[in-house]
Regions:
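Short, recurring structural edge motifs at helix starts
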Residues: 5-11, 40-51, 95-101, 132-138
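Short metal-coordination and nucleic-acid-contact micro-motifs, chiefly zinc-binding Cys/His arrays
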Residues: 16, 53, 103-106, 141-144
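Short cysteine-rich clusters marking metal-coordination/redox-active sites
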Residues: 20-23, 110-113
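Short recognition patches in nucleic-acid-associated and regulatory proteins
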Residues: 25-47, 117-138
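Cys/His-rich microdomains that often coordinate metals
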Residues: 27, 63-64, 117, 155
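Short amphipathic alpha-helical linker/capping segments at the junctions of internal repeats
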Residues: 39-42, 72-87, 128-135, 162-173
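Acidic (E/D-rich), amphipathic helical modules within compact regulatory domains
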Residues: 44-54, 58-91
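Conserved small/polar residues in nucleotide/adenosyl-binding loops
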Residues: 174-181
Length: 181
């Protein structure tokens, strides 16, 4: 099996044959992002600007609280709360609609969720390229016990970009009887 910077994380996710590989991919990315944000990244100005702009969903905020050191969490919170205070509790006369929009916007974005989504797209592209070019990987892919329904839709949507001759072969994985049955 080919090993390069794009294939290694994909192969690592597909090697275990336990559950949905794309759920494992999401878990891996989530773990890496939570570790990253509570590590040295908290001192990088460009990362702090993004975390202040996007904030965190409740689930990822709780992960950061549980994982990070007190100092890293305190530094993240200090700048994030200052940004939230300016946007959601502005000084002076600000239309209520603008404040409501700012409060809602804070609930719609998450630094970790958006990075997971972006990185999942890259890893999914790598997965499909490996499936097209590497027979060993096709074998590994076909040995997965299942792909959960949310990820099944995501994978098929991405696979629709495959060449016309390849897409039906890829779909056969899901429509023909499995040797696991």
């Amino acid at each position: 099996m080919r090993e390069d910077i794009c294939s290694i994380p994909v192969n690592d996710v597909f090697m275990p044959k336990d559950g949905c590989p794309f759920c494992r991919m999401r878990d891996m990315l989530e773990d890496r992002m939570a570790t990253y944000i509570t590590g040295a990244a908290m001192m990088e100005p460009d990362v702090r600007v993004e975390t202040n702009r996007l904030g965190f969903c409740t689930e990822h905020f709780n992960q950061i609280l549980a994982r990070g050191s007190r100092l890293s969490v305190a530094l993240i919170l200090e700048s994030l709360l200052a940004t939230v205070r300016e946007e959601v509790f502005p000084q002076g006369k600000v239309p209520a609609k603008k404040i409501v929009a700012a409060a809602h916007a804070r609930q719609e974005h998450c630094f970790i969720c958006e990075n997971i989504e972006k990185n999942t797209a890259h890893l999914l592209d790598s997965t499909l390229k490996l499936w097209q070019t590497d027979e060993e990987f096709r074998q590994l892919y076909s040995q997965q016990p299942y792909i959960c329904l949310p990820h099944y839709g995501m994978v098929l949507e991405a696979a629709m970009k495959l060449p016309r001759k390849v897409f039906p072969l890829f779909c056969l994985l899901y429509t023909s009887p499995s040797p696991r049955d």
